[in-house]
Every structure is written in structure tokens, then in C-alpha cells.
């Protein structure tokens, strides 16, 4: 079937179709490039409205339109490994075209039925101390990292990609949604340099692209991840940076289509769109898709409707703190606001859950006393409270860690720490084994043994 463009208003195309109308969600190809557009509304017996997924520059009234007979289909499987793709699955890395025989799958389809999903919890170990201790990640689950601008979300996502590729026989799929072109270029270069690109797929819909591309690129990446899970039986780590930009693009599309906005200007279908993405992320059979999602928090407002809609779907919530980042605590993860459904004795073990609970209590008690310390000085506290404050500060510093992906900027080699070492180190600090240590000995190290060696070296230097 063919048709003609009757109106062009930015990324919104009105089309007159010859023959039966294409279904809502089907894509059409416009012009000779071609520009891909998704049908969003039926305006009459022969007229439809579509949102372009590529730039409409050069498209004019009267342009030929070809229907495809279904939703957007993107390539999946081994042929896309090591490639940078756009929202339509086209190569964007100047490499060869994707082979025609590569399997393709539609980006719009329902979530797996509940009966097919594996609801058992398995912990995905990252080697990042504060995450493994306080917010264990669920394999086949969803983790959201909430934070404002400049607190370290993207660096944390990149470190998790490295952890997946180096520690697991799995595939990573990265969706760059509405982020800067510079960041995408840097990530591609760093992955090539570190040798992890051959087990990674990058799918970009960046901030200079039309809202339709930014709106659909997470579904393109998820479809590719599902292809590896269902077709290859591989475990997949899906990283989305940034889910807030997906919601933002949906609001732009909603406004372009003339829908009445809801709270704070968001689209009336906010909850539906977020659920359509999140509910497809699941374990099926023996393979899983594990999602790590960076979520920008506008103006650090955690009551924003987009933030609350996303947080309702995740198993682990990681909150990045601007105050901790200002204090030089990296990763700047707030131990009190960070939670996980896996932090349960039945899943992580009695000792792990006990140490995590005691650590949170110590840091919370320290926060309660900070105003008193600022006004009167720590000397005004009792002996026991001084010890607790010292231990809380040491725990904060012990949970800092140099990242492999940031080594070029920090000059410090990255560290990956087993969960057992993290639990053991925190238990020792809580028990008072490090009460007479300098806080600096625990800053930006891996295990407690490394901190002990640094403390002994400091003392030898002081004695000399």
C-alpha cells in the first residue's frame, strides 16, 4: 500500500493512504531515504497521523509513503554485537550494513505471560561495595539509579557494564536515551579501548534527535536484549541512560499529538508508557534480562511524577546524593535512601543482612548528631557517641571505591571487591577494630586488608 504526505509539522506527518488504513503502531517509510514514522492516530476514512523517528528535514507535501504492514522491526542476534545502532536498527558507526539474513523482531509486543516468568531471586554481584552490601541487584530484575545532574550516574552505569562483561558470560545492551552526543562518543571509544565492545550492543537516540526516536529507542534496545535472551539463551544486562529522557520524549510526542497534559505537564499516559517498558524486563526460562536504569531527578525533586512512576516498578532503588558527591564520597550513593527487596536474610544470608542493618543505624545516628557536632564540636559528645561517629565516618569512607572506567581521570587503578570481603570489612569497622585508624586509610581502597596496609605504612612514616 502507498500514500502521500498531506501535512508536515516538525516531526508530525499527516498522510492520506490508498487502501486500508495501517494499524496504530505500524510504521511507514517516507521518501527515498527513507524516513521511518510510526502511526499514532486515524484522522478519517483515509487519513492517518504519524510521528517521525528520524529528522523530517527535506520532507515535503506530496512525498510518497510506503506502508510496511507492521510495527518497527529491528535486527537481533550475534550480527549486532559490537555495533552502534539507531532507533530503527540501522548502523550508526560507519561499519558494514547488518546482514539481510539477521533475525528481526518487532519492538511493540506484550510482556511475557506471568506463567512463563521465573520469579526466583538471584543476586547479580557487581564488585561495587556499596551496591553489593546495601542494594543487591536482582538477576532478571530492575534497578533504578536516581540522581540529579553531575552526581555520577553515567560513570556508575559504565562500571556496571565492565562488571557484567568481565565477570559473567553475558551480553550487555546499552540504550543511550536523550543524552549528549559527546558522552555517546566517549563511551564508544572507551569500550573499544577496554576490549568489551565485542560483547556489547549500543543503541543511541540522543538529545539532538526527534522526540519519536528518543521515545522508542529504549524499546529497540529491549527488543535486542530479548532476542539474546529468547533466541540465544544468554543472560543480558540492559542499561538505559536515561529513563527520564524517555518519559520526557513521551511528553513531547503527546503534546505534538494535541493530547491534554496531566500533572506538571506530563502526558496523560505516563503510567501506561512506563509500565509497557518495565513489564517486559523479566527472566524467562533459564535466561534473563537484568535492567540497570539511570533516572535523572529534575531539580532533585523525588516527588516528580516521572520519578514516582519509574520507582514503582523496580526491585532495587539506588539514590545518588549531591551532598556526598560534594564531600568527595564516590560512588555518591546515599546508604540511607538506597533499598533493595533482596536485602533479606533468606536471600543474602543472616550476616550480610545484619551488617547492612547495623551500618545504616550507625550512619543514621551520625546524621542525627551532625548539627550538634557543627555547633559544639565532637568533644561535647560522650565517649560512646564519639566512637559511633568515628565508625560511621570510617564506614562511609570504606564504601568509597576507585572505578576501572575512571582510572584515566583519577590516576587510581579500579577495584572489584567480593561481597564476602565487603561484609567482613564493615563488620570489623562496626566491631571497633579500626577505631584508632586514620580515616584516610579507608578512603578509595578495595578490601580492609588494603586499608590495613595503608594504615601501617602511614604509621611507619609517622614514626620515622
Curated annotation (Swiss-Prot):
It comes from the Bacteria. Its main location: membrane. It is a peripheral membrane protein. Keywords: ATP synthesis, ATP-binding, Cell inner membrane, Cell membrane, CF(1), Hydrogen ion transport, Ion transport, Membrane, Nucleotide-binding, Plasmid, Translocase, Transport. The keyword S-adenosyl-L-methionine does not apply. CDD domains: ATP-synt_F1_beta_C, ATP-synt_F1_beta_N, F1-ATPase_beta_CD. Pfam families: ATP-synt_ab (PF00006), ATP-synt_ab_N (PF02874), ATP-synt_VA_C (PF22919). It is an enzyme of class 7 (translocase). It catalyses: ATP + H2O + 4 H(+)(in) = ADP + phosphate + 5 H(+)(out). InterPro entries: AAA+_ATPase, ATP-synt_VA_C, ATP_synth_F1_bsu, ATPase_alpha/beta_chains, ATPase_F1/V1/A1_a/bsu_N, ATPase_F1/V1/A1_a/bsu_N_sf, ATPase_F1/V1/A1_a/bsu_nucl-bd, ATPase_F1/V1_b/a_C. Its EC number is 7.1.2.2. GO terms for molecular function: ATP binding; ATP hydrolysis activity; proton-transporting ATP synthase activity, rotational mechanism. One of its GO terms (cellular component) is plasma membrane. It is found in: Cell inner membrane. The keyword Transmembrane does not apply. ATP binds at residues 147-154. Belongs to the ATPase alpha/beta chains family. F-type ATPases have 2 components, CF(1) - the catalytic core - and CF(0) - the membrane proton channel. CF(1) has five subunits: alpha(3), beta(3), gamma(1), delta(1), epsilon(1). CF(0) has four main subunits: a(1), b(1), b'(1) and c(9-12). Produces ATP from ADP in the presence of a proton gradient across the membrane. The catalytic sites are hosted primarily by the beta subunits. This is ATP synthase subunit beta 2. It comes from Cereibacter sphaeroides (strain ATCC 17029 / ATH 2.4.9). The gene is atpD2.
Amino acid at each position: 500500500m502507498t500514500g502521500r504526505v498531506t501535512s508536515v509539522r516538525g516531526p508530525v506527518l499527516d498522510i492520506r493512504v490508498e487502501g486500508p488504513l495501517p494499524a496504530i503502531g505500524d510504521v511507514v517509510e517516507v521518501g527515498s531515504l527513507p524516513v521511518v514514522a510510526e502511526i499514532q492516530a486515524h484522522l478519517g476514512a483515509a487519513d492517518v497521523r504519524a510521528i517521525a523517528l528520524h529528522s523530517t528535514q527535506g520532507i515535503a507535501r506530496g512525498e510518497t509513503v510506503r506502508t510496511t504492514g507492521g510495527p518497527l522491526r529491528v535486527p537481533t542476534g550475534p550480527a549486532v554485537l559490537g555495533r552502534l545502532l539507531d532507533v530503527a536498527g540501522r548502523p550508526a558507526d560507519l561499519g558494514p550494513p547488518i546482514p539481510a539474513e539477521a533475525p528481526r523482531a518487532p519492538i511493540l509486543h506484550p510482556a511475557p505471560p506471568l506463567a512463563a516468568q521465573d520469579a526466583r531471586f538471584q543476586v547479580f554481584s557487581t564488585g561495587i561495595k556499596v551496591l553489593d552490601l546495601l542494594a543487591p541487584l536482582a538477576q532478571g530484575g530492575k534497578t533504578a539509579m536516581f540522581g540529579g545532574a553531575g552526581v555520577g550516574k553515567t560513570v556508575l552505569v559504565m562500571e556496571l557494564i565492565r562488571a557484567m562483561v568481565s565477570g559473567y558470560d553475558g551480553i550487555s545492551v546499552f540504550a543511550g536515551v536523550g543524552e549528549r552526543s559527546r558522552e555517546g562518543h566517549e563511551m564508544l571509544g572507551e569500550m573499544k579501548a577496554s576490549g568489551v565492545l565485542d560483547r556489547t550492543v549500543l543503541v543511541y537516540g540522543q538529545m539532538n534527535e526527534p522526540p519519536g526516536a528518543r521515545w522508542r529507542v529504549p524499546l529497540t534496545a529491549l527488543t535486542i536484549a530479548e532476542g539474546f535472551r529468547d533466541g540465544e539463551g544468554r543472560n543480558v544486562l540492559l542499561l538505559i541512560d536515561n529513563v527520564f529522557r524517555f518519559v520526557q520524549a513521551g511528553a513531547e510526542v503527546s503534546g505534538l499529538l494535541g493530547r491534554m497534559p496531566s500533572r506538571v505537564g506530563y502526558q496523560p499516559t505516563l503510567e501506561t508508557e512506563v509500565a509497557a517498558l518495565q513489564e517486559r524486563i523479566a527472566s524467562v526460562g533459564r535466561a534473563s534480562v537484568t535492567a540497570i536504569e539511570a533516572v535523572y531527578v529534575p531539580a532533585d525533586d523525588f516527588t516528580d511524577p516521572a520519578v514516582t512512576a519509574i520507582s514503582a516498578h523496580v526491585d532495587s532503588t539506588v539514590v545518588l546524593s549531591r551532598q556526598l558527591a560534594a564531600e568527595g564520597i564516590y560512588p555518591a550513593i546515599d546508604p540511607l535512601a538506597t533499598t533493595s527487596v533482596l536485602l533479606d536474610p533468606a536471600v543474602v544470608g543472616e550476616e550480610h543482612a545484619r551488617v547492612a542493618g547495623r551500618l545504616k543505624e550507625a550512619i543514621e545516628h551520625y546524621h542525627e548528631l551532625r548539627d550538634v557536632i557543627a555547633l559544639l564540636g565532637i568533644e561535647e559528645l560522650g565517649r560512646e557517641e564519639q566512637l559511633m561517629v568515628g565508625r560511621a565516618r570510617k564506614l562511609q569512607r570504606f564504601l568509597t571505591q576507585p572505578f576501572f572506567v575512571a582510572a584515566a581521570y583519577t590516576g587510581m587503578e579500579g577495584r572489584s571487591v567480593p561481597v564476602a570481603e565487603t561484609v567482613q570489612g564493615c563488620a570489623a569497622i562496626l566491631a571497633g577494630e579500626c577505631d584508632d585508624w586514620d580515616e584516610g586509610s579507608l578512603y578509595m581502597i578495595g578490601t580492609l586488608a588494603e586499608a590495613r596496609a595503608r594504615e601501617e605504612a602511614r604509621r611507619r612514616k609517622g614514626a620515622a
